[in-house]
């Protein structure tokens, strides 16, 4: 008897093995490489004449911003020693921050010994495990130069007429004025209602104050702009103070470009504040509006630590900056460039998660 064996099972097996080999090769070829680890960026920005804006990333970069209050293209802004995040009152970016603050209590000798090189290890040690819950991060809020002029809200709101402010215009010739709030009425949870103010201003630089003016301004319907020489004006005119809700803003700093600043005087009666008296206050004592957040409550530097150096000393604290689900770590490592020029801020940053 002759036996015949079919060759097809053998052929099918060979084809199956070949197909498996091709599939394995294809899988090997399509394997993706793991993403590169986050890189540490280091940039220096000129924060001397105007705010400098930084977009964090791999790497971080400086960006040009025309209107920071409407732009989401920046994460951090730097001006002199101030740092703002693009969130809350400062901008629409939803950026928040948190300070790890390991060096908050550093001694003078410890600060003097700190350098960008020897503080790199502390920066590198911050990982995703260092990141707290998102609720621990905070956005920026307005930090007005004129605050504390009212206590309470709604029916309990009351003016604080013992607090006066010397107001300084520095655009062009320096012009001084004085201002206080004497009464509020019709206040709600969100607005001081009718605000009665007293103020006076020099008609020209070096002159005595003019007559004291008294006005009651209704801020319930929206912002009221006040020129201390001309009275209430439109938003597009030159103005010194803006009253809105429970805020009084000066036309300077983050609130305007008018070069207006203010200095609290709660120890001198309003009637005793003359132009001659006001002129004795040094210009560095005045404040413009700023944004206050983590970088304000937990500063990145100490000043004049020896009592005679008059220098800015970075404390090399590491800050966490959150944009959506992405968190970056930031360390400010310098205020001066190699030539000793101030307001040249050096920032070290890297993505954490």
Description of each model-found segment:
Residues 2-16:
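Bacterial N-terminal signal peptides that target proteins for export
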Residues 17-21:
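Sec-dependent N-terminal signal peptides
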Residues 31-353:
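Surface-exposed, beta-sheet-biased, low-hydrophobicity segments with strongly acidic/polar composition
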């Amino acid at each position: 008897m002759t036996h015949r064996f079919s060759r097809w099972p053998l052929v099918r097996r060979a084809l199956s093995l070949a197909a498996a080999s091709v599939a394995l090769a294809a899988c090997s070829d399509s394997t993706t490489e793991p993403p590169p680890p986050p890189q540490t960026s280091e940039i220096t920005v000129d924060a001397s004449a105007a705010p400098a804006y930084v977009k964090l990333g791999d790497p971080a970069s400086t960006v040009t911003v025309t209107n920071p209050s409407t732009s989401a293209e920046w994460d951090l802004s730097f001006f002199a020693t101030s740092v703002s995040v693009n969130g809350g009152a400062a901008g629409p970016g939803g950026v928040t921050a948190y300070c790890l603050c390991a060096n908050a209590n550093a001694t003078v000798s410890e600060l003097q010994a700190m350098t960008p090189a020897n503080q790199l290890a502390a920066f590198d040690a911050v990982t995703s495990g260092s990141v707290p819950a998102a609720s621990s991060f905070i956005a920026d809020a307005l930090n007005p130069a004129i605050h504390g002029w009212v206590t309470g809200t709604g029916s309990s709101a009351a003016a604080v007429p013992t607090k006066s402010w010397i107001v300084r215009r520095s655009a062009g010739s320096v012009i001084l004025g004085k201002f206080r709030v004497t009464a509020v009425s019709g206040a709600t949870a969100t607005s001081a209602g009718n605000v009665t103010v007293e103020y006076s201003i020099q008609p020209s630089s070096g002159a005595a104050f003019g007559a004291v003016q008294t006005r009651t301004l209704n801020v319930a319907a929206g912002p009221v702009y006040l020129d201390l020489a001309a009275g209430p004006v439109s938003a597009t005119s030159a103005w010194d103070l803006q009253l809105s809700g429970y805020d009084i803003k000066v036309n300077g700093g983050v609130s305007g470009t008018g070069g207006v600043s203010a200095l609290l005087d709660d120890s001198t009666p309003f009637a005793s504040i003359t132009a001659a008296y006001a002129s004795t206050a040094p210009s560095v004592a005045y404040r413009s509006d700023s944004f206050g957040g983590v970088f304000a409550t937990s500063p990145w530097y100490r000043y004049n630590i020896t009592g005679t150096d008059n220098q800015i000393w970075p404390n090399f604290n590491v800050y966490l900056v959150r944009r959506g689900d992405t968190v970056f770590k930031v360390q400010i490592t310098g205020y001066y460039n190699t030539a000793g020029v101030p307001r040249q801020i050096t920032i070290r940053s890297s993505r954490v998660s």
